[in-house]
């Protein structure tokens, strides 16, 4: 459950370390975002001399949340942190690697490139 002012870790090698959510992009006037939702965020921490700099406004997709995710089978999944992957306007990741596990629900929301880069899909 991600809302405005939420800090997220960055799960790729685009150069950013931490993001702060500015707006959840979803259908309707939704306050919270979950796994697979796109957000507009600002970079709060970044690695020097990389593609993304501090205070850049970027688009990202949420890949992990601490809020439990309930599946249709009755199983719930909860991750250790809130994390996102920075994407471009077409929805492709800016980085070339994705760190940590991602949820299977990303495949249903047409983020197959992120799923294929991830080391583990849960």
Swiss-Prot record:
GO terms for biological process: translation. Part of the 50S ribosomal subunit. Forms a cluster with proteins L3 and L19. In the 70S ribosome, L14 and L19 interact and together make contacts with the 16S rRNA in bridges B5 and B8. CDD domains: Ribosomal_uL14. One of its GO terms (cellular component) is cytosolic large ribosomal subunit. The keyword Transmembrane helix does not apply. GO terms for molecular function: large ribosomal subunit rRNA binding; structural constituent of ribosome. Keywords: Ribonucleoprotein, Ribosomal protein, RNA-binding, rRNA-binding. Belongs to the universal ribosomal protein uL14 family. Binds to 23S rRNA. Forms part of two intersubunit bridges in the 70S ribosome. It comes from Picosynechococcus sp. (strain ATCC 27264 / PCC 7002 / PR-6). It holds the Pfam family Ribosomal_L14. This is Large ribosomal subunit protein uL14.
